[in-house]
Amino acid sequence: MGSQVLQILRQGVWASLTGGWFFDPHQSTFSNCFHLYVWIFLLIFPFLLYMVLPPSLMVAGVYCLVVAVIFATIKTVNYRLHAMFDQGEIVEKRNSTMGEQEEEAAQGESSLPRDPGVEMTVFRKVSSTPPVRCSSQHSVFGFNQVSELLPRMEDSGPLRDIKELVREQGSNNVIVTSADREMLKLSSQEKLIGDLPQTPPGVVPDPSLPSTDSSERSPMAGDGVPWGGSGVADTPMSPLLKGSLSQELSKSFLTLTRPDRALVRTSSRREQCRGTGGYQPLDRRGSGDPMPQKAGSSDSCFSGTDRETLSSFKSEKTNSTHLDSPPGGHAPEGSDTDPPSEAELPASPDAGVPSDDTLRSFDTVIGAGTPPGQTEPLLVVRPKDLALLRPSKRRPPMRGHSPPGRTPRRPLLEGSGFFEDEDTSEGSELSPASSLRSQRRYSTDSSSSTSCYSPESSQGAAGGPRKRRAPHGAEEGTAVPPKRPYGTQRTPSTASAKTHARVLSMDGAGGDVLRAPLAGSKAELEAQPGMELAAGEPAVLPPEARRGPAANQPGWRGELQEEGAVGGAPEETGQRECTSNVRRAQAIRRRHNAGSNPTPPASVMGSPPSSLQEAQRGRAASHSRALTLPSALHFASSLLLTRAGPNVHEASNFDDTSEGAVHYFYDESGVRRSYTFGLAGGGYENPVSQPGEQAANGAWDRHSHSSSFHSADVPEATGGLNLLQPRPVVLQGMQVRRVPLEIPEEQTLMEEAPPRAQHSYKYWFLPGRWTSVRYERLALLALLDRTRGVMENIFGVGLSSLVAFLGYLLLLKGFFTDIWVFQFCLVIASCQYSLLKSVQPDAASPMHGHNWVIAYSRPVYFCICCLLIWLLDALGTAQPFPPVSLYGLTLFSASFFFCARDVATVFTLCFPFVFLLGLLPQVNTCLMYLLEQIDMHGFGGTAATSPLTAVFSLTRSLLAAALLYGFCLGAIKTPWPEQHVPVLFSVFCGLLVAMSYHLSRQSSDPTVLWSLVRSKLFPELEERSLETARVEPPDPLPEKMRQSVREVLHSDLVMCVVIAVLTFAVSASTVFIALKSVLGFVLYALAGAVGFFTHYLLPQLRKQLPWFCLSQPVLKPLEYSQYEVRGAAQVMWFEKLYAGLQCAEKYLIYPAVVLNALTVDAHTVVSHPDKFCLYCRALLMTVAGLKLLRSAFCCPPQQYLTLAFTVLLFHFDYPRLSQGFLLDYFLMSLLCSKLWDLLYKLRFVLTYIAPWQITWGSAFHAFAQPFAVPHSAMLFLQALLSGLFSTPLNPLLGSAVFIMSYARPLKFWERDYNTKRVDHSNTRLVTQLDRNPGADDNNLNSIFYEHLTRSLQHTLCGDLVLGRWGNYGPGDCFVLASDYLNALVHLIEVGNGLITFQLRGLEFRGTYCQQREVEAITEGVEEDEGCCCCEPGHLPRVLSFNAAFGQRWLAWEVTASKYVLEGYSISDNNAASMLQVFDLRKILVTYYVKSIIYYVSRSPKLETWLNHEGIAAALRPVRALGYADSDPTFSLSVDEDYDLRLSGLSLPSFCAVHLEWIQYCASRRSQPVDQDWNSPLVTLCFGLCVLGRRALGTASHSMSASLEPFLYGLHALFKGDFRITSPRDEWVFADMDLLHRVVAPGVRMALKLHQDHFTSPDEYEEPAALYDAIAANEERLVISHEGDPAWRSAILSNTPSLLALRHVMDDASDEYKIIMLNRRHLSFRVIKVNRECVRGLWAGQQQELVFLRNRNPERGSIQNAKQALRNMINSSCDQPLGYPIYVSPLTTSLAGSHPQLRALWGGPVSLGAIARWLLRSWERLHKGCGAGCNSGGNVDDSDCGGGGGLTSLSNHPPLAHPTPENAAGSSEQPLPPGPSWGPRPSLSGSGDGRPPPLLQWPPPRLPGPPPASPAPTEGPRPSRPSGPALLNSEGPSGKWSLGGRKGLGGPDGEPASGSPKGGTPKSQAPLDLSLSPDVSSEASPARTTQDLPCLDSSIPEGCTPSGAPGDWPVPAEERESPAAQPLLEHQY
């Protein structure tokens, strides 16, 4: 805690004060000195110039020139150095620091090529969203995070008893395995390993020799004789291109050498092994040994300091690592004085590079061969520094102790270091090391979780079974530890203090572990090139080895990146496209932009799902804070540790199944394998290499996920590849501790850094001339911020010069004196320094990590303030304007300007504190805020959603005002005649109202408008974009938006003309002048009364708790009393009244008020010119009129109060201050909006800190509560300022102390974050099969919020207009809460008939705090009977005193308790309970077989399959007598047709059970097929059913009778993962449609039938019933895996029903669920939240997590506070501040898409609709006259008002809202499809869901061109009941029309595209088209549950004329899902 506070003070507070400079102990001395000197120069230089030289512009010019030169030089060098690193031209250079003796020792190798090294690329985030850390879902460890789980067991003596260990560890679990027991036993013995046979040098290994078994044998060299030091391949690394580390490697890879080496790693723990691994106290040091501890700088993803911006050197201080010296060796002390530039490392995930430890932890593998008969000793040394084993000048070693005859051996990795570029391209297919296609084992390293290869001990040439040997002087099977040398020298070594276990290599087959003394510290290793260990191992790395990193690390990191575990992507986008056969390692925590949970690990080592289940149980335990080892570690320990047990022995015979018996066998590929019985074997078979085998044959495919084990395809390589063979490791002293959630991925994926090669880069300073520069990118990034472009550099130099010029200009002007001169120079220096090294993260930065925009904030603001000071001073001096008095304030006087100048001057001097407190936003946010405020408060605009939209909106308003200004000026410049209004003024009024109406209807986002323009002007671009978009399933949303905007534009074209003409007529009359004394007050009173009734009284009566006194709404919707909503909400009378009053208010009352004020003011100005000139008065009138009218059109709920306050204040209270009603109204509207903000802020603050309901989330909250009392006065001042500037008031760290944040626009979140889906369309196939990406509840459930967003898009605007959410305004926030969906809805832009909103979905089952708050908003308070401390009860329907008091002290209120919205009801059943017993599984398998037979018989390719020769030949043996498929996956318990006699599946037994079903299915075919028992059809069905069941058994490992493997296999088949492993099934590859169209849908359909079996077990006994059920399900239901894009497409297309099998792998669960979705209408509670509460809490979260770097996942600011919904609101922030599972894009809802509102208002008007209405009216009149003349005959029903118009075109019956009677029967049936959100092709031929059309019906006669609608024979589809269907079925102009009874384009306003809907023609009797009882039963709900209201007044609600198409039954097979056939034919 203390170190974190110091870090915040140093990197946050101090850096903010200085502009970015602070002392960073983690950086090099050069870097700190450079920063200090630059900052001092920028501070002192202007100060000295001002103090020493006389003030003149010449000095200012010199100052600017010097600053420009310095900045240009620094920026140029920085830019060119980055370009140098990008080019990657490396100059090889000899190690200059190598000592003479070391050079002699390396003489033999000096000619080898040096490691050129590869420069690091700068990594940046793959996405803009850092990972989630705060969610309840993210306390997950991955398999490779074992390092963070392993404890340290530091024993105080050489011998410790197990009981002592357990007692010492307390409650922590210690896993003590047989290997540990061996270590404890052996630790008491100290015996030196005797002299071992020497190995002659020069023996070269034979590359053809095999690698040995990973658990049984060791790598061999040559004929079993270990080699000395001889040549090795010297393939250098190719240079980097464009700075990417993942570029192509050279033609040939570096050859690894020396397979017989032990692993040597330096240890970072202060511990040492004594003897054979006995535990030794590590703290016994000499008195002179220092013991520095870790520096405590724990960086997480929330710390975005300079260390995170690639400028950190060492995150830990030096530790003393004590290791044993080799026997006989003297270890001289050496200093750890490594050049800091070699240790410069980043620690920032967000800066784009891995963290400090990530790059610092490469393993170095050294060692030498061991004689055949000896078990080689283990050298375990672990460095934790990048400068690992670097050469340095140290005392020469004593070589006399080396055994004679030995020469120094070469290192394991020589020459050009093997893949030193540890960072590989994120998306590359091949990481460098993995390109060798090697199989690897990964040790769980402590802080790095990296792989370490453990080469095997050497073995004799004989390839027989391994014998356990003891070293010299030891008995067989006993390990003899060496003695510890007496005079071990201990030297300090830099190390990490995070290691919790040592990873030791051990002999897999033998039960003994031989350990040599550990190598000494780094100094000893580096200083003794000639020293040899007891086993003949050199303890020194020659120079080449120092440069050679471990070969495994780069590939490990590359794979993790490739799997998405490492959050970085290289700067350059070039990536290799290679194929690799390497099985990818487990990714730790997959990062989804969705913010969903990390993907759990797949089953490792080819394990069956049981281990996967175990893995997830381990995760669940870790989540519940139980100290349990994660399953992956359990698995590794059981597999690896137990093999060291003494019971492992070779099997005595074939039947030996005793514990530890090892059997050998050959698999089908000829690979020799071993299998060990019992725990020692771990249940897995291991490959055993033999003499002469290829190395590839010995590799074990550890990561195979198929049911059969197979070898990896490792290509033939040299013996060096043996290093990469798997090798078990021992995890010593394992103990689990809890992993803090804030550990970033980059810190859990640490890799030990290799020793960096000393190389230089070519720096081209002139064309053709270069010099060598020895530097690296990380050091440069630590030194200076990177600027990527030339223009950015030029802009930075220019900005720094401008800062210097303007600052010095103010100094020359004399604005500052005394100490303020120095303060101003400090401000100048901070602004300039931020252009070189900015504050990261800044207090105003909305994101973690490096924010490049922030770097420009200070200088830009400084320039603006300086210009403002200079301008105000000039204006005050010149006084160009005469002073004006407005509302008692004198404006434009000299004192006014000077006062403003002084305020700006003081503000500029306070810049360091302003930026420390974060009171100024970053530049782009400030620009957007200013433009939005000007547009909203000056011109009545709507909110902006981005800086671009703000610019567009303000430009549009300025153009409109400029156009109107000319008319207004011309009208008031000429004198007016008495009692007359000039025509020009009337024209101005007409244009003003019309343009205000049009602007209020347009969105501020021009994207859709531009797409319309582009489609008209540039159709080729549109076609190109469409072709690109066809790759994914089509999204109907963009086209629907374009259609809606097109309708609005066409409607406005008509309505604006009408409005302008009417307004002109009214204004031209003299009504406003003649009645100006009376009319104004009448209009004010009318507006006030209507507004009060509409916006106060009605909403209060409709609230859940009216006035917080009544317990029920007075005006209840029809659904209020329903327990379960059955249909769409009914339109109530008070909703119609509310909408009608709003219409009258918007379009009649307020335009009249504004026109009256305009006319009166203009008349007054013309008659009596006032203090304003005419030009100013015309401008004021234009702007005020535009603003007031647009505000009235957009947001009428707030207008009546503004008008009332204006009248009261300026007509009665202060009439002398009035400047005319129009200007008064304009000013009061601005003032009222600020007062509303202030009111909301005060309510939030008082509610939050009310002492009787304070909820302290932490101890800090309790501590800060008393300090809030003296803070109250300051708090009120802050509230006033924040209300004035629209800034949030945020609680500091969630406490009761509030501080003001920076100004934000209405869209107050600055990052455009929205959730990206994770499904099979955007993930790799291998991850789909192995890891099932996104298989967690959050990712899978996010689709329901996406569907909810689409539903709201159709209905939200209309529902708001109908008053169903109460009063609303821009910026309001609502919470929608139902049983499982909890979403936060932000209203951003509120226009006239449009709403732009964003929805944020929370977790279904969230944290404890979230559940408490959900309970608070969903539970009722009606039952509360308390009054103070007693319970007297309450009056009927009235709240008790306590409940009423409590509801008033909440920051939220329930506005509707029954808001009906279309969505999906989700039912999930646990699949385990439904398949627990064998009988239930047998039912499923039987339905599986029947479904396969059904799909075979229905397939159109059946004839092709039956005639296929290959298929017939493969199935011919099936018909032989006595044939049975005896696969072990078949059993009597699950296969109904199992043949006991033949012990398998035979054709006769199959026919005995399924022949009747086959014959029935064949009989339903149109073409007859042979159906005999031995016919090709039956044989094909038999073959496919056997294949399908074998695939299920193979996937589920059905040898086991347990349920989990069965579910695993069922889920694998359900998602399409078919593994055809048997040669007998390969005939299916003759046509893949056999799998795609038969077997795959069969397993899905079987699951649905199995579900139905529980409701009616005997329903499907008859073949006809089963056949019809499958056919109905096939057409009505979409059955798909949730990862399939078809699933998302089906949901977004509003499919009625869906089914899926979900495998949930969350941290707390691992189970299979059957998910059933049914589309229906859901009931939500609508809770309106105080918008300032949301703004304040979000601002507080941002400040706490980004700037204050609070990493605590259980921080107090997210604990539940029911009065403010603190947890729910904070959870909905953008990730990583919050953790919503879905964030929608900004979505616009239009009123025209609401069907009920359109029915109420008639819809938009267009020219085409008007023309059609006129023609129809004429035709109707003509027919009526003709019928009247023909002896009084009746007119056709179709022409009597019920048949034409909109209703005839509607694709729905006119029945608007079903009554309970006619809707009662529909509860059992799935609802008909709702809004037509996408193309919904039908599966049938007609496609419209009706019987074949009656062709004799005459189509309606339509004059004019034919309608652009479906053909006359194509009738309405019941699957499209919503409004948008009307948009698609229209006339040539494609527009709506008004309702028929309203005159314009009534129901007859549209051409009929099918038969008239009003009734059948007279010539036709009503037809009963019911096909069958089933059909009619299906049709009934389709008819009675339509959403559309009755559109024609002549038809009573709830009824339809007989024979209307609405009465037509819907055949069952036609009621199809919207996704249609493409959704049912999935691709696998």
From Swiss-Prot:
Q: Which topology term describes how it sits in the membrane?
A: Multi-pass membrane protein
Keyword vocabulary terms for this entry: Glycoprotein, Membrane, Phosphoprotein, Transmembrane, Transmembrane helix
Q: Keyword Transmembrane: yes or no?
A: yes
UniProt subcellular location? Membrane
Glycosylated residue positions: N95, N319, N1770
Q: Which GO terms describe its cellular component?
A: membrane
Start-end of Low complexity biased regions: 444-459, 1966-1977
Q: Which family does it belong to?
A: Belongs to the pecanex family.
Q: What is this protein called?
A: Pecanex-like protein 3
Origin organism is Mus musculus
Lineage of the native species? Eukaryota, Metazoa, Chordata, Craniata, Vertebrata
Gene name tied to this protein: Pcnx3
